[in-house]
Amino acid sequence: MVAARARRRKRASVTQLYSTCKAAGTCPPDVIPKVKGTTLADKILQWSGLGIFLGGLGIGTGSGTGGRTGYIPLGGGGRPGVVDIAPARPPIIIEPVAPTEPSIVNLVEDSSIINSGSTIPTFTGTDGFEITSSSTTTPAVLDITPSAGTVHVTSTNIENPLYIEPPFIEAPQSGEVSGHIFTSTPTSGTHGYEEIPMEVFASNVTTGKEPISSTPTPGVRRIAAPRLYSRAFSQVKVTNPDFISKPSTFVTFDNPAFEPADTSLSFEEPTDVAPDPDFLDIIKLHRPALTSRRGTVRFSRLGQKATIRTRSGKQIGARGHYYHDISSIAPAEELEMQPLLSPSTNNYSYDIYADLNEAETGFMQPTQTTPMLRSPFSPLSTQLPSLSSSVSSSYANVTIPFSTTYNVPIHTGPDVVLPTSPTVWPFIPHTSIDTQHAIVIQGGDYYFVAVYIFVTQTP
């Protein structure tokens, strides 16, 4: 039978052996070098550390404490940084309290200096205080009136030599003397100031041309007409006149009790077929508009359809222009204009008219002889041919002569045509000397041609 082997006990550590065997001097030979770090491995590290730096890794036979400097964390430098250490506060001294002393500690130390305050006055007399009284008859009133000084009174008189009014009788009025002199009632004298006419800015009388705003803008601002006939709107003509008064009956079968005619109409998502197929899927009808196009008065509304509905709830659809022609505008009638006066028989450009009632006595002589043409420079004389003028008194067209310097007869021009005119030049119309006639001249341009005849004098 094999005897049981005794259990091996663990040897004590080097530090424990060194603390017990150092005093007795019985330390094993391998304990003291390990404690003092003089083993062969320690010496090799010391010799190699003279040439290389191992970073304080603590390689040796001692405990793994990282050597004298300890372990360095990864990512740090080779040497630890300088750490600022704040000065330490002085420790608080705890004083014990005896059982017989109170537990309340005074925060303020007792002072040995006692302040007794101000000194108490001492009275030596025995009569006490002396009371005196005084009386006066002057009231305690402060004089706030300033000291008297000189007062300068000035007056201003303005005269305008360019405009002087007639003097008015005014009497002087007293009691109104200040820096300027004014008169409140008409008194004797003449105005000493200039009267400026006042202009009325605000008046109840309006002319219709006043601006309606404080800063009127010149010109006329025109409101842009709705673009109902663009490509964005489909044109739908509605022939039923109920579209003007009851537009909702074309979308739904329900007829509301009150339906405003000038507002937009909104409808819920249609579930049934619309009464009118043109209004299918209509969800909104905008407010109406009256326009005139191509000779008609047109009632229009814009309609919004909801044909497609997205997942987000947005409705997409086309827009249409629904219109109904109310009435046609007839063209303006052309009225034939009738003349108010009968057409005149005289179509001449230049005519001279005389009063027929007074002209009857002036045209009774049948003939007229042409006078002699004499020149003041020559004794010669020239006899012009004698022509007859048979102008009837029933005609109103009479040509009158104009006087000339050398008694030259005046003949009719191409613009004046007589009823019975001779073809031989010249023609001298008959004039009446004793009868005055009222003459009316109608025309625009008159030309006076002076005819001069010069006769040479022979020696």
Curated annotation (Swiss-Prot):
Disulphides: 21-27
Function statement: Minor protein of the capsid that localizes along the inner surface of the virion, within the central cavities beneath the L1 pentamers. Plays a role in capsid stabilization through interaction with the major capsid protein L1. Once the virion enters the host cell, L2 escorts the genomic DNA into the nucleus by promoting escape from the endosomal compartments and traffic through the host Golgi network.
Coiled-coil ranges from the UniProt annotation: none
Subcellular location: Virion; Host nucleus; Host early endosome; Host Golgi apparatus
GO terms (BP aspect): microtubule-dependent intracellular transport of viral material towards nucleus; symbiont entry into host cell; viral penetration into host nucleus
Post-translational modification: Highly phosphorylated.
Family: Belongs to the papillomaviridae L2 protein family.
Keywords: Capsid protein, Cytoplasmic inwards viral transport, Disulfide bond, DNA-binding, Host endosome, Host Golgi apparatus, Host nucleus, Host-virus interaction, Late protein, Microtubular inwards viral transport, Phosphoprotein, Viral penetration into host nucleus, Virion, Virus entry into host cell
Subcellular location, principal: virion
GO cellular component terms attached to this protein's record: host cell; host cell endosome; host cell Golgi apparatus; host cell nucleus; viral capsid
Name of the protein: Minor capsid protein L2
Placement of sequence motif Nuclear localization signal: 1-12, 454-458
Top-level taxon of origin: Viruses
Subunit structure: Interacts with major capsid protein L1. Interacts with E2; this interaction inhibits E2 transcriptional activity but not the DNA replication function E2. Interacts with host GADD45GIP1. Interacts with host HSPA8; this interaction is required for L2 nuclear translocation. Interacts with host importins KPNB2 and KPNB3. Forms a complex with importin alpha2-beta1 heterodimers via interaction with the importin alpha2 adapter. Interacts with host DYNLT1; this interaction is essential for virus intracellular transport during entry.
Gene Ontology MF: a single term: structural molecule activity
